[in-house]
């Protein structure tokens, strides 16, 4: 098969070779010095379902800025789907005591979250005027209704059974969320890991109703404190805990960027779904996934090593916790 450019262009002849591989027509051609291959089986478009993907942007208004709003949120949903996928893999790896592999997976989740953080900058190009041209068309549609976002929160450890209510009209999504609600979270798997390593994790934290809100325990905080105080003795647990902490750190940064973007676009208006908008998002910043991993940091003290006596008795930390000041005096 030969192909020629139009007469106005320099004539180029390309020979396409056709073969049959595994019963599928395959083709090969040399273009710009590169051998390009394709077949009638799996193509780029078929693999990625690009026809379906690129036809899924259906505005409800005739306002041009709505396309940005739709694509921004659709891409966010895809990244959240990947984060959920990786979180499930990480839980399987921790359950199997494959901590090195779990660290790699947690690193990937952190990278996904960092990408999601920067994606808010795209939505921030939407001015208040731009958004108001189509906001009314959205009616009560709201990110609060994202079942994937809720799935990710459940996977990481923030469980709220009452949040299933908004999915009552979709039995399939509600059932999927309910399954995650009643399953152990990433933090539950970490507690099981601590127990396997001999730490005194209370039985009621290991064998509990996973659909209920987790209540922190002093014994769990003590376990993390021991690991962080003596990292050389518990290096794999210490290293894993830092990866887990990074996941929450980036998730909270994503929440913060979400809140600031909403504030920039709509101020303190009520959200489209009826929530308090910015005020609701501010409250979410105080909802931790791994509470004892954060709490024990306040109790850590500096080792008495030469002239390093700062905070040796923990008084400075307690004062900072009491008055809310920065440990550097700011």
Residue spans for each PLM region:
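Surface-exposed peri-terminal alpha-helical interaction modules
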Residues: 3, 8-330
């Amino acid at each position: 098969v030969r192909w020629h450019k139009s007469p106005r262009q320099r004539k180029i002849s390309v020979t396409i070779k056709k073969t049959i591989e595994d019963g599928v027509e395959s083709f090969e051609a040399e273009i710009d010095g590169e051998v390009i291959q394709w077949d009638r089986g799996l193509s780029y478009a078929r693999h990625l379902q690009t026809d379906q993907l690129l036809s899924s942007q259906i505005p409800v208004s005739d306002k041009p800025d709505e396309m940005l709003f739709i694509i921004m949120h659709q891409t966010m949903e895809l990244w959240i789907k990947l984060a959920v996928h990786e979180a499930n893999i990480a839980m399987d790896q921790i359950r199997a005591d494959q901590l090195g592999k779990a660290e790699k997976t947690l690193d990937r989740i952190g990278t996904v979250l960092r990408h999601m953080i920067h994606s808010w900058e795209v939505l921030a190009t939407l001015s208040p005027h731009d958004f108001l041209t189509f906001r009314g068309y959205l009616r009560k549609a709201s990110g609060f209704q994202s079942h994937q976002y809720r799935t990710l929160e459940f996977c990481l450890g923030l469980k709220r059974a009452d949040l299933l209510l908004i999915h009552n009209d979709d039995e399939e999504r509600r059932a999927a969320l309910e399954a995650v609600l009643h399953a152990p979270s990433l933090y539950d798997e970490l507690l099981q890991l601590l127990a396997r390593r001999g730490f005194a994790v209370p039985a009621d934290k290991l064998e509990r109703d996973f659909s209920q809100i987790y209540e922190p325990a002093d014994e769990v905080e003590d376990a993390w404190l021991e690991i962080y105080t003596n990292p050389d003795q518990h290096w794999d647990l210490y290293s894993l805990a830092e990866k887990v902490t990074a996941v929450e750190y980036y998730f909270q940064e994503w929440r913060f960027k979400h809140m600031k973007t909403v504030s920039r676009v709509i101020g303190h208006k009520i959200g489209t779904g009826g929530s308090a908008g910015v005020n609701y998002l501010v409250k979410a910043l105080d909802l931790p996934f791994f509470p004892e991993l954060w709490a024990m940091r306040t109790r850590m003290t500096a080792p008495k090593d030469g002239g390093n006596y700062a905070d040796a008795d923990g008084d400075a930390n307690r004062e900072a916790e009491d008055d809310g000041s920065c440990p550097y005096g700011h």
